[in-house]
Every structure is written in C-alpha cells, then in structure tokens.
UniProtKB/Swiss-Prot annotation:
InterPro entries: Ribosomal_uL5 (IPR002132), Ribosomal_uL5_bac-type (IPR020930), Ribosomal_uL5_C (IPR031309), Ribosomal_uL5_CS (IPR020929), Ribosomal_uL5_dom_sf (IPR022803), Ribosomal_uL5_N (IPR031310). This is Large ribosomal subunit protein uL5. Keywords: Ribonucleoprotein, Ribosomal protein, RNA-binding, rRNA-binding, tRNA-binding. NCBIfam families: PRK00010.1. It comes from Sphingopyxis alaskensis (strain DSM 13593 / LMG 18877 / RB2256) (Sphingomonas alaskensis). The gene is rplE. GO terms for biological process: translation.
Amino acid sequence: MADNYTPRMKKLYDDKIVKAMTDKFGYKNAMEVPKIEKITLNMGVGEATQDKKKVEAAAAEMELIAGQKPVVTKAKKSIAQFKLREGMPIGCKVTLRRERMYEFLDRLITIAMPRIRDFRGVSAKSFDGRGNYAMGLKEQIIFPEINYDRIDQVRGMDVIVTTTARTDEEARELLRLFGFPFPIEAQEKEAA
C-alpha cells in the first residue's frame, strides 16, 4: 500500500469516533479512547478428517476474503468418535491488524452484511464482558471476492473483533460508531 494511503475506517475513527467517544465517556486523554486492536477470522472444517483438500479449499477462500494467508489449525487431541487424530488439519484462521483490519471491517459492514439473507442486524449480546465482540457468519458467499460457481461447499466462519475497551458498553458504542448494525431495541434498552 502507498505511504500516504489511510483506510476509510481509520480516517473515520481518527476524525469522528475519537471525539464522539470522548464526549460520551469523558476520557481525559486521546489514548484512553478504545480502539479495535485486531480482527480474527476462524473457519472450522469438520469434514477435513475425511478429505484433506477441504482445508486447502477453505484456506484459499479465506485468503481471498482476508487478503492475507491463513494459518491451518490442527487438532490438539485425538478423538476417536470423530475419527480425529492429534495434528490433523481441522480448520484455518487469520489475524488482521492495522490497514488490512480496517479494510476488512469496511468490506464487512458496507458490502458483506447487507448481503446476508433475512438480515436484521447483529446481536448486541455477543460481547464477552471484556469489550470483545464475536459473531458468526453462516456463508462465505456474502463476500464479493468469493465466486459462487467455484466453491465446493458453503462454509461459515467466526469473526472476533478484539478491542481495547474495558467494558462492553464502551465496545458496543465503538462498534456502533463504526457502523455495526445493532438492533434498535438493544439501543433503546441501553438508553433507558
């Protein structure tokens, strides 16, 4: 990427979100304002126990979505019922930081989420108590990088947004300002 290029979401954070968060929560220092630290994408491929090529296909799709090569995750323990042995590839994950993270966040919010079938916003209850947010996507085909005709099967993935926020309330406000579509009822309950 060029030296003078700043992702749209990073610019939004610097120009508007820092000020809005400071006004709402009364931070004394700009460094206190929570920010998104990293976004982790995880795709579990259970069918990989029978066919090793499934993990390779999943990793290739994730590389297209994230713009970064994923790490293949391996089984930590052997489980006989699942025909799983220790060290077998069972999925892939990728951790996005800095510019790539902001670019992915932009694509997720503006392009991918509106393409989800029967989409009514993301759950406001998926915070972990420490200001991190996790959500599941049922289909990888919501991303425009994935060619529907080339996929072998529809797979879901987990998207974990790790923030520096100390509370869920701060994290919810941060993600709302970034454009995460939380349902209106959740925002009204929070205000009451």
